[in-house]
Protein backbone atom coordinates (compact mmCIF):
# COMPACT_ATOMS: atom_id res chain seq x y z
CA UNK A 1 0.00 0.00 0.00
CA UNK A 2 2.93 2.35 0.64
CA UNK A 3 4.03 1.80 -2.96
CA UNK A 4 0.58 2.85 -4.16
CA UNK A 5 0.70 6.00 -2.03
CA UNK A 6 4.02 7.03 -3.58
CA UNK A 7 2.61 6.40 -7.05
CA UNK A 8 -0.40 8.65 -6.52
CA UNK A 9 1.56 11.37 -4.73
CA UNK A 10 3.58 11.89 -7.91
CA UNK A 11 0.45 13.08 -9.65
CA UNK A 12 -0.28 15.76 -7.07
CA UNK A 13 -4.04 15.43 -7.32
CA UNK A 14 -6.42 13.31 -5.27
CA UNK A 15 -8.85 12.90 -8.14
CA UNK A 16 -6.72 12.74 -11.29
CA UNK A 17 -5.76 9.10 -10.72
CA UNK A 18 -3.96 7.45 -13.63
CA UNK A 19 -4.87 3.83 -13.02
CA UNK A 20 -4.43 2.43 -16.51
CA UNK A 21 -0.60 2.04 -16.29
CA UNK A 22 -1.04 -0.15 -13.20
CA UNK A 23 -2.73 -2.73 -15.42
CA UNK A 24 0.76 -3.68 -16.66
CA UNK A 25 2.37 -4.09 -13.24
CA UNK A 26 3.27 -7.54 -11.95
CA UNK A 27 2.21 -7.09 -8.33
CA UNK A 28 -1.37 -6.25 -9.37
CA UNK A 29 -1.92 -9.79 -10.60
CA UNK A 30 -0.12 -11.19 -7.60
CA UNK A 31 -2.66 -9.40 -5.41
CA UNK A 32 -5.55 -10.46 -7.61
CA UNK A 33 -4.73 -14.14 -7.46
CA UNK A 34 -3.29 -14.19 -3.92
CA UNK A 35 0.07 -15.34 -5.24
CA UNK A 36 3.50 -14.14 -4.20
CA UNK A 37 5.54 -12.29 -6.77
CA UNK A 38 7.67 -15.33 -7.56
CA UNK A 39 4.65 -17.59 -7.75
CA UNK A 40 2.31 -18.47 -10.55
CA UNK A 41 1.83 -15.71 -13.11
CA UNK A 42 1.50 -15.70 -16.93
CA UNK A 43 3.16 -17.46 -19.75
CA UNK A 44 2.06 -17.87 -23.36
CA UNK A 45 1.46 -21.35 -24.76
CA UNK A 46 0.52 -22.48 -28.24
CA UNK A 47 -3.13 -23.12 -27.35
CA UNK A 48 -4.05 -20.72 -24.60
CA UNK A 49 -2.70 -18.54 -21.81
CA UNK A 50 -2.18 -20.07 -18.37
CA UNK A 51 -0.20 -19.15 -15.29
CA UNK A 52 3.48 -19.86 -14.88
CA UNK A 53 6.62 -18.42 -13.35
CA UNK A 54 7.11 -15.21 -15.31
CA UNK A 55 4.95 -12.20 -15.93
CA UNK A 56 5.09 -10.46 -19.31
CA UNK A 57 3.80 -6.98 -20.09
CA UNK A 58 3.55 -8.07 -23.72
CA UNK A 59 1.03 -10.72 -22.75
CA UNK A 60 -1.31 -8.24 -21.05
CA UNK A 61 -1.03 -5.77 -23.93
CA UNK A 62 -1.75 -8.55 -26.38
CA UNK A 63 -4.78 -9.66 -24.37
CA UNK A 64 -6.29 -6.17 -24.46
CA UNK A 65 -5.52 -5.80 -28.16
CA UNK A 66 -7.09 -9.14 -29.02
CA UNK A 67 -10.20 -8.29 -27.01
CA UNK A 68 -10.84 -5.25 -29.20
CA UNK A 69 -9.89 -7.06 -32.40
CA UNK A 70 -12.10 -10.06 -31.70
CA UNK A 71 -14.97 -7.78 -30.84
CA UNK A 72 -14.85 -6.36 -34.38
CA UNK A 73 -14.20 -9.76 -35.98
CA UNK A 74 -17.24 -11.30 -34.36
CA UNK A 75 -19.39 -8.66 -36.04
CA UNK A 76 -17.86 -9.17 -39.49
CA UNK A 77 -17.34 -12.91 -39.71
CA UNK A 78 -20.38 -15.19 -39.86
CA UNK A 79 -18.52 -18.48 -39.62
CA UNK A 80 -20.04 -20.36 -36.68
CA UNK A 81 -16.88 -22.32 -35.83
CA UNK A 82 -14.77 -19.17 -35.80
CA UNK A 83 -17.29 -17.32 -33.66
CA UNK A 84 -17.38 -20.19 -31.19
CA UNK A 85 -13.57 -20.10 -30.90
CA UNK A 86 -13.67 -16.34 -30.50
CA UNK A 87 -16.18 -16.61 -27.64
CA UNK A 88 -14.08 -19.22 -25.84
CA UNK A 89 -10.93 -17.12 -26.04
CA UNK A 90 -12.78 -13.95 -25.05
CA UNK A 91 -13.99 -15.54 -21.82
CA UNK A 92 -10.42 -16.24 -20.83
CA UNK A 93 -9.17 -12.81 -21.85
CA UNK A 94 -11.89 -11.01 -19.92
CA UNK A 95 -11.46 -13.15 -16.83
CA UNK A 96 -7.71 -12.51 -16.81
CA UNK A 97 -7.94 -8.75 -17.18
CA UNK A 98 -10.98 -8.37 -14.94
CA UNK A 99 -9.19 -9.87 -11.95
CA UNK A 100 -6.39 -7.35 -12.16
CA UNK A 101 -8.70 -4.51 -13.14
CA UNK A 102 -10.86 -5.07 -10.04
CA UNK A 103 -7.86 -4.61 -7.77
CA UNK A 104 -6.75 -1.48 -9.63
CA UNK A 105 -10.12 0.26 -9.30
CA UNK A 106 -10.09 -0.30 -5.53
CA UNK A 107 -6.63 1.14 -4.91
CA UNK A 108 -7.39 4.89 -4.56
CA UNK A 109 -10.40 4.21 -2.35
CA UNK A 110 -8.48 1.73 -0.20
CA UNK A 111 -5.80 4.33 0.49
CA UNK A 112 -8.36 6.92 1.62
CA UNK A 113 -10.32 4.34 3.61
CA UNK A 114 -7.27 3.05 5.49
CA UNK A 115 -6.13 6.56 6.35
CA UNK A 116 -9.64 7.34 7.62
CA UNK A 117 -9.63 4.20 9.78
CA UNK A 118 -6.27 5.14 11.26
CA UNK A 119 -7.61 8.56 12.22
CA UNK A 120 -10.73 7.09 13.83
CA UNK A 121 -8.70 4.57 15.82
CA UNK A 122 -7.27 7.45 17.82
CA UNK A 123 -10.71 8.92 18.53
CA UNK A 124 -12.81 5.76 18.99
CA UNK A 125 -11.43 3.03 21.26
CA UNK A 126 -12.03 -0.55 20.11
CA UNK A 127 -13.25 0.59 16.70
CA UNK A 128 -12.78 -2.97 15.44
CA UNK A 129 -15.91 -3.94 17.40
CA UNK A 130 -17.96 -1.67 15.14
CA UNK A 131 -17.34 -4.12 12.29
CA UNK A 132 -19.71 -6.57 13.94
CA UNK A 133 -23.20 -6.74 12.47
CA UNK A 134 -24.58 -6.97 16.00
CA UNK A 135 -23.06 -3.55 16.77
CA UNK A 136 -26.02 -2.07 14.87
CA UNK A 137 -28.65 -3.36 17.29
CA UNK A 138 -27.37 -1.69 20.50
CA UNK A 139 -27.46 1.54 18.51
CA UNK A 140 -31.08 0.84 17.52
CA UNK A 141 -31.94 0.01 21.13
CA UNK A 142 -30.55 3.33 22.27
CA UNK A 143 -32.05 5.52 19.53
CA UNK A 144 -35.28 4.07 18.18
CA UNK A 145 -37.10 4.04 21.51
CA UNK A 146 -37.09 7.87 21.37
CA UNK A 147 -38.24 8.17 17.74
CA UNK A 148 -41.69 8.13 16.15
CA UNK A 149 -41.48 7.09 12.48
CA UNK A 150 -39.34 4.84 10.34
CA UNK A 151 -38.98 4.65 6.56
CA UNK A 152 -38.25 1.21 5.17
CA UNK A 153 -36.25 1.88 1.99
CA UNK A 154 -35.29 -0.50 -0.82
CA UNK A 155 -32.46 0.93 -2.90
CA UNK A 156 -33.47 1.07 -6.61
CA UNK A 157 -32.17 -1.72 -8.79
CA UNK A 158 -31.43 -2.59 -11.60
CA UNK A 159 -29.60 0.39 -13.02
CA UNK A 160 -28.51 1.46 -16.50
CA UNK A 161 -24.94 0.35 -17.15
CA UNK A 162 -23.74 3.76 -18.29
CA UNK A 163 -24.82 5.21 -14.93
CA UNK A 164 -22.35 2.88 -13.18
CA UNK A 165 -19.54 4.34 -15.28
CA UNK A 166 -20.72 7.91 -14.68
CA UNK A 167 -20.77 7.32 -10.92
CA UNK A 168 -17.10 6.34 -11.01
CA UNK A 169 -16.34 9.23 -13.34
CA UNK A 170 -17.10 11.60 -10.49
CA UNK A 171 -14.24 10.05 -8.52
CA UNK A 172 -11.76 8.88 -11.13
CA UNK A 173 -11.03 10.88 -14.27
CA UNK A 174 -8.72 8.35 -15.87
CA UNK A 175 -10.35 8.01 -19.29
CA UNK A 176 -8.60 4.77 -20.43
CA UNK A 177 -9.66 2.92 -17.26
CA UNK A 178 -13.25 4.07 -17.54
CA UNK A 179 -13.26 3.18 -21.24
CA UNK A 180 -12.03 -0.33 -20.42
CA UNK A 181 -14.71 -0.71 -17.75
CA UNK A 182 -17.36 0.42 -20.23
CA UNK A 183 -16.02 -2.15 -22.68
CA UNK A 184 -16.35 -4.97 -20.11
CA UNK A 185 -19.90 -3.99 -19.27
CA UNK A 186 -20.77 -3.72 -22.95
CA UNK A 187 -19.45 -7.20 -23.70
CA UNK A 188 -21.14 -9.04 -20.85
CA UNK A 189 -24.52 -7.36 -21.04
CA UNK A 190 -27.17 -6.47 -23.52
CA UNK A 191 -26.19 -2.87 -24.17
CA UNK A 192 -29.42 -2.13 -26.03
CA UNK A 193 -31.48 -2.82 -22.91
CA UNK A 194 -32.27 0.00 -20.52
CA UNK A 195 -31.76 -2.26 -17.52
CA UNK A 196 -29.43 -5.08 -16.59
CA UNK A 197 -31.08 -8.35 -17.67
CA UNK A 198 -30.82 -11.26 -15.27
CA UNK A 199 -29.50 -13.74 -17.82
CA UNK A 200 -26.63 -11.63 -19.09
CA UNK A 201 -25.56 -10.70 -15.58
CA UNK A 202 -24.50 -14.26 -14.84
CA UNK A 203 -20.90 -14.08 -16.07
CA UNK A 204 -19.81 -10.62 -14.96
CA UNK A 205 -21.27 -11.13 -11.50
CA UNK A 206 -20.24 -14.77 -11.23
CA UNK A 207 -18.29 -16.12 -8.28
CA UNK A 208 -14.96 -15.31 -9.92
CA UNK A 209 -15.92 -11.68 -10.54
CA UNK A 210 -17.72 -10.82 -7.31
CA UNK A 211 -15.00 -8.36 -6.38
CA UNK A 212 -15.75 -6.10 -9.33
CA UNK A 213 -19.49 -6.46 -8.80
CA UNK A 214 -19.25 -5.47 -5.14
CA UNK A 215 -17.08 -2.49 -6.03
CA UNK A 216 -19.54 -1.21 -8.64
CA UNK A 217 -22.53 -1.88 -6.41
CA UNK A 218 -21.00 -0.16 -3.37
CA UNK A 219 -20.07 2.90 -5.42
CA UNK A 220 -23.65 3.07 -6.70
CA UNK A 221 -25.13 2.70 -3.21
CA UNK A 222 -22.72 5.35 -1.95
CA UNK A 223 -24.07 7.73 -4.58
CA UNK A 224 -27.62 7.01 -3.40
CA UNK A 225 -26.69 7.68 0.22
CA UNK A 226 -24.87 10.90 -0.61
CA UNK A 227 -28.20 12.62 -1.20
CA UNK A 228 -29.13 12.05 2.45
CA UNK A 229 -25.80 13.33 3.72
CA UNK A 230 -25.87 16.36 1.43
CA UNK A 231 -29.39 17.44 2.42
CA UNK A 232 -28.69 16.91 6.11
CA UNK A 233 -25.43 18.86 6.05
CA UNK A 234 -27.01 21.78 4.21
CA UNK A 235 -29.90 21.96 6.67
CA UNK A 236 -27.71 22.38 9.76
CA UNK A 237 -25.05 24.86 10.68
CA UNK A 238 -23.33 22.31 12.92
CA UNK A 239 -22.09 19.09 11.36
CA UNK A 240 -23.59 15.88 12.68
CA UNK A 241 -21.22 14.10 15.04
CA UNK A 242 -22.37 10.66 13.90
CA UNK A 243 -21.72 11.21 10.17
CA UNK A 244 -18.52 9.64 8.92
CA UNK A 245 -16.09 11.17 6.42
CA UNK A 246 -16.97 10.37 2.82
CA UNK A 247 -14.66 10.07 -0.14
CA UNK A 248 -14.21 13.38 -1.95
CA UNK A 249 -15.69 13.44 -5.44
CA UNK A 250 -16.17 15.98 -8.23
CA UNK A 251 -19.34 17.51 -9.60
CA UNK A 252 -21.58 16.02 -6.90
CA UNK A 253 -22.76 19.26 -5.35
CA UNK A 254 -23.53 20.66 -8.78
CA UNK A 255 -25.64 17.63 -9.62
CA UNK A 256 -27.47 17.62 -6.30
CA UNK A 257 -28.50 21.25 -6.65
CA UNK A 258 -30.45 20.37 -9.77
CA UNK A 259 -32.95 18.16 -7.98
CA UNK A 260 -36.43 19.08 -9.20
CA UNK A 261 -37.72 20.46 -5.91
CA UNK A 262 -34.54 21.70 -4.27
CA UNK A 263 -33.55 24.37 -6.76
CA UNK A 264 -30.73 26.77 -6.22
CA UNK A 265 -32.83 29.91 -5.96
CA UNK A 266 -34.97 28.62 -3.08
CA UNK A 267 -32.45 26.18 -1.62
CA UNK A 268 -32.60 27.30 2.00
CA UNK A 269 -36.38 27.53 1.95
CA UNK A 270 -36.80 23.97 0.73
CA UNK A 271 -34.24 22.60 3.16
CA UNK A 272 -36.00 24.17 6.12
CA UNK A 273 -38.44 21.29 5.94
CA UNK A 274 -35.65 18.89 6.91
CA UNK A 275 -34.62 20.46 10.19
CA UNK A 276 -34.89 17.40 12.39
CA UNK A 277 -32.04 16.84 14.87
CA UNK A 278 -33.23 13.31 15.65
CA UNK A 279 -32.82 11.41 12.41
CA UNK A 280 -30.79 8.24 11.93
CA UNK A 281 -29.89 6.17 8.88
CA UNK A 282 -28.73 2.54 8.76
CA UNK A 283 -28.18 0.33 5.73
CA UNK A 284 -27.36 -3.32 5.16
CA UNK A 285 -26.91 -4.40 1.53
CA UNK A 286 -29.88 -3.18 -0.55
CA UNK A 287 -32.15 -2.26 2.35
CA UNK A 288 -31.93 0.80 4.58
CA UNK A 289 -33.78 2.33 7.51
CA UNK A 290 -34.42 6.05 7.98
CA UNK A 291 -35.84 6.81 11.44
CA UNK A 292 -36.96 10.21 12.72
CA UNK A 293 -38.59 11.88 15.69
CA UNK A 294 -40.43 14.21 13.35
CA UNK A 295 -43.97 14.04 12.07
CA UNK A 296 -45.40 11.89 9.31
CA UNK A 297 -45.41 14.97 7.07
CA UNK A 298 -41.64 15.32 7.48
CA UNK A 299 -41.08 11.68 6.52
CA UNK A 300 -43.21 12.16 3.41
CA UNK A 301 -40.98 15.10 2.44
CA UNK A 302 -37.91 12.88 2.76
CA UNK A 303 -39.61 10.26 0.61
CA UNK A 304 -40.57 12.83 -2.03
CA UNK A 305 -37.05 14.24 -2.30
CA UNK A 306 -35.45 10.79 -2.46
CA UNK A 307 -37.76 9.75 -5.28
CA UNK A 308 -36.91 12.91 -7.21
CA UNK A 309 -33.21 12.41 -6.60
CA UNK A 310 -33.38 8.84 -7.95
CA UNK A 311 -35.26 10.02 -11.00
CA UNK A 312 -32.93 12.92 -11.82
CA UNK A 313 -29.63 11.24 -10.97
CA UNK A 314 -30.24 7.64 -12.05
CA UNK A 315 -33.13 8.14 -14.48
CA UNK A 316 -35.50 5.96 -12.49
CA UNK A 317 -39.19 6.54 -12.89
CA UNK A 318 -41.05 7.25 -9.69
CA UNK A 319 -41.00 4.15 -7.47
CA UNK A 320 -42.92 5.07 -4.30
CA UNK A 321 -43.43 1.39 -3.45
CA UNK A 322 -39.74 1.20 -2.51
CA UNK A 323 -40.24 3.49 0.50
CA UNK A 324 -42.72 2.58 3.23
CA UNK A 325 -43.36 4.95 6.15
CA UNK A 326 -44.54 3.33 9.37
CA UNK A 327 -45.15 4.49 12.90
CA UNK A 328 -42.81 2.68 15.25
CA UNK A 329 -45.42 2.12 17.94
CA UNK A 330 -47.86 0.44 15.51
CA UNK A 331 -45.74 -1.42 12.96
CA UNK A 332 -42.68 -3.64 13.04
CA UNK A 333 -40.05 -3.74 10.31
CA UNK A 334 -37.85 -6.57 9.05
CA UNK A 335 -34.16 -5.73 9.02
CA UNK A 336 -31.01 -7.89 9.14
CA UNK A 337 -32.83 -11.08 10.06
CA UNK A 338 -34.88 -9.58 12.91
CA UNK A 339 -38.43 -8.34 13.17
CA UNK A 340 -37.96 -5.12 15.14
CA UNK A 341 -40.49 -2.80 16.76
CA UNK A 342 -40.89 -0.31 19.59
CA UNK A 343 -43.16 -1.73 22.26
CA UNK A 344 -45.01 0.49 24.72
CA UNK A 345 -45.24 -0.84 28.27
CA UNK A 346 -47.42 0.76 30.93
CA UNK A 347 -46.37 0.70 34.55
CA UNK A 348 -48.84 1.66 37.26
CA UNK A 349 -47.57 4.13 39.84
CA UNK A 350 -49.50 5.20 42.95
CA UNK A 351 -49.20 8.91 43.63
CA UNK A 352 -50.39 10.73 46.72
CA UNK A 353 -51.13 14.43 47.03
CA UNK A 354 -52.13 15.69 50.46
CA UNK A 355 -54.95 13.38 51.56
CA UNK A 356 -55.80 12.07 48.08
CA UNK A 357 -54.09 9.20 46.32
CA UNK A 358 -54.52 8.07 42.74
CA UNK A 359 -53.09 5.57 40.27
CA UNK A 360 -51.20 6.77 37.21
CA UNK A 361 -50.12 4.70 34.19
CA UNK A 362 -46.67 5.68 32.95
CA UNK A 363 -45.84 4.57 29.39
CA UNK A 364 -42.30 3.46 28.60
CA UNK A 365 -40.95 2.60 25.16
CA UNK A 366 -38.70 -0.40 24.64
CA UNK A 367 -36.98 -1.62 21.49
CA UNK A 368 -38.00 -5.22 20.84
CA UNK A 369 -36.52 -7.80 18.46
CA UNK A 370 -37.92 -11.24 17.66
CA UNK A 371 -37.03 -14.03 15.25
CA UNK A 372 -39.44 -14.11 12.27
CA UNK A 373 -40.44 -17.73 11.71
CA UNK A 374 -41.91 -17.43 8.19
CA UNK A 375 -38.73 -16.12 6.46
CA UNK A 376 -36.60 -18.70 8.27
CA UNK A 377 -38.93 -21.54 7.27
CA UNK A 378 -38.72 -20.27 3.70
CA UNK A 379 -34.91 -20.41 3.89
CA UNK A 380 -35.06 -23.96 5.25
CA UNK A 381 -37.31 -24.92 2.33
CA UNK A 382 -34.81 -23.45 -0.16
CA UNK A 383 -31.99 -25.36 1.54
CA UNK A 384 -34.17 -28.52 1.42
CA UNK A 385 -34.24 -29.13 5.17
CA UNK A 386 -38.05 -29.17 5.28
CA UNK A 387 -41.10 -28.87 3.04
CA UNK A 388 -43.38 -25.86 2.64
CA UNK A 389 -45.45 -27.02 5.63
CA UNK A 390 -42.40 -26.96 7.91
CA UNK A 391 -42.08 -30.75 8.23
CA UNK A 392 -38.43 -31.88 8.37
CA UNK A 393 -37.06 -33.91 5.46
CA UNK A 394 -33.76 -35.67 4.89
CA UNK A 395 -30.83 -34.09 3.06
CA UNK A 396 -29.94 -36.65 0.35
CA UNK A 397 -26.91 -34.66 -0.86
CA UNK A 398 -25.19 -35.18 2.51
CA UNK A 399 -26.07 -38.87 2.83
CA UNK A 400 -22.71 -39.92 1.39
CA UNK A 401 -20.77 -38.15 4.15
CA UNK A 402 -19.65 -39.76 7.37
CA UNK A 403 -21.91 -39.65 10.43
CA UNK A 404 -19.57 -37.22 12.17
CA UNK A 405 -19.55 -34.85 9.19
CA UNK A 406 -23.34 -34.91 8.90
CA UNK A 407 -23.83 -34.15 12.59
CA UNK A 408 -21.13 -31.47 12.45
CA UNK A 409 -22.77 -29.68 9.50
CA UNK A 410 -26.21 -29.62 11.08
CA UNK A 411 -24.78 -28.67 14.45
CA UNK A 412 -22.77 -25.81 12.96
CA UNK A 413 -25.90 -24.37 11.33
CA UNK A 414 -27.78 -24.55 14.64
CA UNK A 415 -24.96 -22.93 16.58
CA UNK A 416 -24.61 -20.12 14.04
CA UNK A 417 -28.35 -19.43 14.13
CA UNK A 418 -28.36 -19.41 17.94
CA UNK A 419 -25.33 -17.16 17.98
CA UNK A 420 -26.81 -14.63 15.58
CA UNK A 421 -30.34 -14.64 17.05
CA UNK A 422 -29.16 -14.33 20.65
CA UNK A 423 -30.63 -10.82 20.66
CA UNK A 424 -34.20 -12.06 20.27
CA UNK A 425 -36.52 -11.46 23.22
CA UNK A 426 -38.62 -14.50 22.30
CA UNK A 427 -36.96 -17.79 21.43
CA UNK A 428 -39.98 -19.93 20.47
CA UNK A 429 -39.40 -19.45 16.73
CA UNK A 430 -35.72 -20.27 17.10
CA UNK A 431 -36.52 -23.45 19.03
CA UNK A 432 -38.81 -24.55 16.22
CA UNK A 433 -36.09 -24.01 13.61
CA UNK A 434 -33.61 -25.99 15.71
CA UNK A 435 -36.14 -28.80 16.06
CA UNK A 436 -36.53 -28.93 12.25
CA UNK A 437 -32.77 -29.11 11.78
CA UNK A 438 -32.38 -31.74 14.49
CA UNK A 439 -35.02 -34.02 12.96
CA UNK A 440 -33.68 -33.38 9.45
CA UNK A 441 -30.28 -34.56 10.66
CA UNK A 442 -31.85 -37.70 12.14
CA UNK A 443 -33.72 -38.41 8.89
CA UNK A 444 -30.51 -37.95 6.90
CA UNK A 445 -28.64 -40.41 9.11
CA UNK A 446 -31.53 -42.88 8.97
CA UNK A 447 -31.59 -42.60 5.18
CA UNK A 448 -27.88 -43.28 5.02
CA UNK A 449 -28.16 -46.43 7.17
CA UNK A 450 -31.43 -47.49 5.49
CA UNK A 451 -33.34 -47.38 8.73
CA UNK A 452 -36.19 -45.44 10.32
CA UNK A 453 -35.83 -42.44 12.59
CA UNK A 454 -37.47 -44.27 15.50
CA UNK A 455 -35.19 -47.28 15.15
CA UNK A 456 -32.19 -44.98 14.83
CA UNK A 457 -33.03 -43.10 18.04
CA UNK A 458 -33.78 -46.37 19.84
CA UNK A 459 -30.44 -47.86 18.87
CA UNK A 460 -28.20 -44.84 19.53
CA UNK A 461 -30.33 -42.63 21.75
CA UNK A 462 -30.99 -38.93 21.39
CA UNK A 463 -27.96 -37.79 23.38
CA UNK A 464 -25.77 -37.67 20.27
CA UNK A 465 -27.74 -34.61 19.08
CA UNK A 466 -27.62 -32.68 22.36
CA UNK A 467 -25.12 -30.23 20.89
CA UNK A 468 -28.01 -28.81 18.87
CA UNK A 469 -29.51 -27.47 22.10
CA UNK A 470 -26.44 -26.25 23.96
CA UNK A 471 -27.68 -23.83 26.56
CA UNK A 472 -26.62 -20.25 25.90
CA UNK A 473 -25.85 -19.66 29.57
CA UNK A 474 -23.42 -22.59 29.62
CA UNK A 475 -21.56 -21.18 26.64
CA UNK A 476 -21.37 -17.69 28.13
CA UNK A 477 -20.11 -19.05 31.45
CA UNK A 478 -17.12 -20.49 29.61
CA UNK A 479 -16.39 -17.13 27.98
CA UNK A 480 -17.20 -14.91 31.01
CA UNK A 481 -16.43 -16.71 34.31
CA UNK A 482 -18.22 -13.96 36.27
CA UNK A 483 -21.56 -15.18 34.87
CA UNK A 484 -21.31 -18.36 36.93
CA UNK A 485 -22.41 -16.53 40.05
CA UNK A 486 -26.20 -16.37 40.66
CA UNK A 487 -26.20 -12.57 40.70
CA UNK A 488 -24.87 -12.40 37.13
CA UNK A 489 -27.05 -15.07 35.56
CA UNK A 490 -28.58 -14.40 32.13
CA UNK A 491 -32.30 -13.97 32.67
CA UNK A 492 -34.95 -15.39 30.37
CA UNK A 493 -35.79 -13.00 27.54
CA UNK A 494 -32.61 -10.96 28.02
CA UNK A 495 -30.91 -9.99 24.78
CA UNK A 496 -27.21 -10.55 24.14
CA UNK A 497 -25.33 -8.90 21.26
CA UNK A 498 -21.98 -10.25 20.12
CA UNK A 499 -19.22 -8.08 18.68
CA UNK A 500 -17.51 -10.80 16.66
CA UNK A 501 -20.16 -11.42 13.96
CA UNK A 502 -19.02 -9.96 10.64
CA UNK A 503 -21.48 -11.75 8.34
CA UNK A 504 -25.05 -13.03 8.48
CA UNK A 505 -25.74 -16.75 8.41
CA UNK A 506 -26.70 -17.95 4.93
CA UNK A 507 -30.15 -19.08 6.12
CA UNK A 508 -30.83 -15.62 7.57
CA UNK A 509 -29.36 -13.91 4.52
CA UNK A 510 -31.70 -15.76 2.16
CA UNK A 511 -34.81 -15.08 4.21
Swiss-Prot record:
Usually encoded in the trnK tRNA gene intron. Probably assists in splicing its own and other chloroplast group II introns. It is found in: Plastid, Chloroplast. PANTHER family: MATURASE K. This is Maturase K. The keyword Lipid biosynthesis does not apply. It comes from the Eukaryota. Pfam families: Intron_maturas2, MatK_N. The lineage of its organism: Eukaryota, Viridiplantae, Streptophyta, Embryophyta, Tracheophyta. Its main location: plastid. GO terms for molecular function: RNA binding. Belongs to the intron maturase 2 family. MatK subfamily. One of its GO terms (cellular component) is chloroplast. GO terms for biological process: mRNA processing; RNA splicing; tRNA processing. Keywords: Chloroplast, mRNA processing, Plastid, RNA-binding, tRNA processing.
